[in-house]
Curated annotation (Swiss-Prot):
Function, as annotated: Facilitates the functional incorporation of the urease nickel metallocenter. This process requires GTP hydrolysis, probably effectuated by UreG.
Pfam families named in the record: cobW
Chain residues that bind GTP: G11, P12, V13, G14, S15, G16, K17, T18
InterPro entries: CobW/HypB/UreG_nucleotide-bd, P-loop_NTPase, UreG
Keyword Acetylation: no
Gene Ontology annotations for the cellular component aspect, listed alphabetically: cytoplasm
Single GO MF descriptor: GTPase activity
Top-rank taxon: Bacteria
The protein's name in its UniProt record: Urease accessory protein UreG
Length: 209
């Protein structure tokens, strides 16, 4: 059976996780990648509805599923990811020719990581509006993620954040692990992020040719 790569996408509330999914999905599809999407909310499926609206006419809405976890975001993707695993397995069974399934966690703090039983890789999203010091906070989500996304770079002048300092601090705490700075409104850094996903997740670890 074909291996469908599972990619977790985590980060604090409002960092732009959903927006990242919305901008990378059509770009992945333009490169021949067939995606599936799962979103997590604690008491609603609002993110899934938002993604369906944004990607209407681009991705079949049956390939976008919302999971109402009823629990802390990290619990649903790490300590007890059973609800998400069930959703993943159901989507994979319905669409076995897919290449990647993106699993967006609910918004959480810098300690959020994904269980290896749920995700093969994960992307962690922070945003400039959280403050210049965020990379120095050194949380496991930020440090251990396979790719770190520093989103909303356009907000830097409004919150007094120096992007060069954020980038320098990121290199210190992450070493050689990849990161990218993005602006989903302008598309800045988005193609670079897609390049990373293709290179590090898909071409290297799947049957995509």
């Amino acid at each position: 059976m074909k291996k469908i790569i599972r990619v977790g996408i985590g980060g604090p509330v409002g960092s732009g996780k959903t927006a990242i999914i919305e901008v990378i999905t059509p770009r992945l599809m333009q490169r021949g990648i067939k995606p599936l999407i799962i979103t997590n909310d604690i008491v609603t499926t609002e993110d899934a509805k938002q993604v369906k609206r944004t990607l209407k006419g681009i991705l079949d809405e049956e390939k976008i599923v919302g999971v109402e976890t009823g629990a802390c975001p990290h619990t649903a993707v790490r300590e007890d990811p059973s609800m998400n695993i069930a959703a993943v397995e159901e989507l994979e069974a319905r669409f076995p020719d897919s290449d990647v399934i993106m699993i967006e966690s609910g918004g959480d703090n810098l300690t959020l990581t994904f269980s290896p039983a749920l995700a093969d890789f994960y992307i962690y999203v922070i945003d400039v509006a959280e403050g210049e010091k965020i990379p120095r906070k050194n949380g496991p989500g930020l440090v251990q993620a396979d790719i770190l996304v520093i989103n909303k770079t356009d907000l830097a002048p409004y919150v007094g954040a120096d992007l060069s300092v954020m980038e320098s601090d990121t290199k210190v705490v992450r070493g050689d692990r990849p990161y990218v700075m993005t602006n989903c409104k302008t598309g800045e850094g988005v193609e670079e992020l897609v390049d990373m996903i293709m290179r590090d997740f898909l071409f290297t670890h799947s049957e995509i040719k």
